[in-house]
Every structure is written in C-alpha cells, then in structure tokens.
Amino acid sequence: MTDPAHHDDRPTLVIKVGGNDLDDATFVAELARVVAAIRPLPVLVHGGGKEIGILQETLGSTPRFVGGLRYTDATALTAAEMVLCGSVSTRLVAALIAAGADALGISGVDRGLIRVVKQEHPAGDLGRVGRPTAVRGEVLRDLLDHGVIPVIAPIALGPDGPYNVNADEAAGAVAAALGVSEAVFVTNVPGVLVKGDVMRYLTRSEIERLIADGTISGGMIPKVRAALTALDAGVHAARITNLEGLLNQGTTIITEREPHE
C-alpha cells in the first residue's frame, strides 16, 4: 500500500480513462501499474464504454448517442450506474490495490462530490445527462492526503437526483477544482490525429477549425472540448494520449502558440 504519510504539496494529476478498454484485463493491469507509481498521487476518472451499452440492451433498451454523448433515459441511467459505480469501479480499485496502491471508488453522488444541472445540447435532448457546476475538491484532497487514490465514477448529483456525466467533462471539472498541473485524457489513439500524424500541440482556434472541417469528430469532440474547459478553469495543461504515452506523450492542448512555434 502507498504510505499515507507520503504527501506532496505540488498539484496532482487528473487522469481520465475511457471505458472501451476497461474490460481488457491486460490493459487494466498495466494502467494500474503506471498510475500506482505516479507521484504526487493522481486522481483517476473513468468511463464505462461498451459495457454500458451491452447492459442497456440486456435491460431492453437500445443505446443511442447525440453529438457524441450518450442519450440517457431511465434505463440507460440504471445501466450506467451499475457499470460505472459497480463493475468498472471495482475492477479498477482491485487492480490498483494489486499494484501496491491504496484506492477508493467514489461516484460524483457520494458526499455530493460533483454537482450538475441538466445539460443542453444543440444536437438534441440528452435525457438525464448533467453538466458539472461544482466539485468538492476538499473531499478528494482529504483522500490524497491520506495516501488514497480516488477512482471517480461519473454519476453526479443534480437537483432531482443522479445524472450521467460524460467522463471527459467530469475529469475536466475535477481537474479545474483541484487546480492540477495537468489533466490527461487517455484514449485508444496516441493523440489528436491530423492526416495520420499526432499533433504535438493544438490551440483553441486550431481545434475549432479541425472540428468544423470534420478532422476531429465523434467521441474525440468531447475530449478536446473538456481539455479546453479545463484550461479555461485554470488547469495548466491538458493532454490527449494513449496508455503508452500517459506520462509524457500525446497532444497537448494549449491556449495559444508561442511566436517561435
């Protein structure tokens, strides 16, 4: 286990990992090994990916997406809660403990960690999908101060009960609340690809142009938007990468380029 006395006053790292690889035991074990070794201790935010859709279908509902975000009716919310707060959270916590870390699974509902309002989207109604409005950073700092890695499931508390939250947006909100040095969004690609090449840096204006021309599309859009939101809220850097590049590779989202870049 991590020594609870080990404390570092530097800002920590917030890592968001997507759900589509979290049913791969080898990936989960390697992720846990890398995350457990990071100092200062990081915060991990996870998705649920295809496991949510599979369970949703088992419950008799067909998954659908609006603008890259999961439409969440009552059945979809039940599936998301069961997968995110249940099987995926337990799997990640078990892997981190096996890797020598101390970890605790927590959702955005627990202790009112993440508060949300219903998210509006120009592409249509999203159902019970929330937009983060507040994060109780002190809850996470207390865990970190005691040597515990928080593993956050993005089910959050709205004015009328639980809401599903896009994990990228949840990670951006958590990163902003903690004032972290960097938010890292782990995907199944090595970064934002333009004509097959990983872009080392991208600015807001470049991202908007690449979204407009279709180069950035689908599930990558919420990731780059969350990265920009994290920057707007004061996070020093936001990076999109894969597991192999978690520590220092991928695409770093910046406010603007220096003149020599």
UniProtKB/Swiss-Prot annotation:
Binding site for substrate: G48, G49, R70, N164
Location in or out of the cell: Cytoplasm
This protein's UniProt keywords: Amino-acid biosynthesis, Arginine biosynthesis, ATP-binding, Cytoplasm, Kinase, Nucleotide-binding, Transferase
Entry's Gene Ontology molecular function annotations: acetylglutamate kinase activity; ATP binding
Site description Transition state stabilizer, residues in chain: K16, K223
One GO BP annotation of this record: L-arginine biosynthetic process
Pfam family, one: AA_kinase
GO cellular component: cytoplasm
Catalytic function, reaction form: N-acetyl-L-glutamate + ATP = N-acetyl-L-glutamyl 5-phosphate + ADP
Pathway: Amino-acid biosynthesis; L-arginine biosynthesis; N(2)-acetyl-L-ornithine from L-glutamate: step 2/4
EC number: 2.7.2.8
Purpose of the protein: Catalyzes the ATP-dependent phosphorylation of N-acetyl-L-glutamate.
Family to which the UniProt record says this protein belongs: Belongs to the acetylglutamate kinase family. ArgB subfamily.
Protein name: Acetylglutamate kinase
Source species of the chain: Roseiflexus sp. (strain RS-1)
Gene behind this protein: argB
